[in-house]
Amino acid sequence: MENLNPNTILRVAVDLAKRVYQIHAVNQFEAVALTKAMTPGKFFDWCRSLPAGCMVAMESCSGAHYVGRRLAAMGLSPRIIAAHHVKPYRVAGAKAKNDANDAAAICEAASRPHLHSVPIKTA
């Protein structure tokens, strides 16, 4: 996974937390290209290597608008999705609620073309 070519990434989903962001990326064949936890600083550094216009999806939360503005400034396409739209794509089960599964559910929800997203608010 470290030899990953960022130009092959079609869509990235990130589960935002205070200290660690969980990343889930898929390629043009909808296959998982990367699943990794990163600090916010390393995440933004990594995002600079993504192709312009790459979709980066996240679940709506207090920090999502800040992250969305930073990603838009890098030339990426941020998409904030309301939590109730992500919930149907989560894996069922008692131990399924974790950051990695949440990021995968966000990625799956973002693949739906007619799913309403939250507009990014200005500072």
Outline where the language-model segments fall:
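Phosphate- and other anionic-substrate recognition elements at nucleic-acid/protein interfaces
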Residues: 1-123
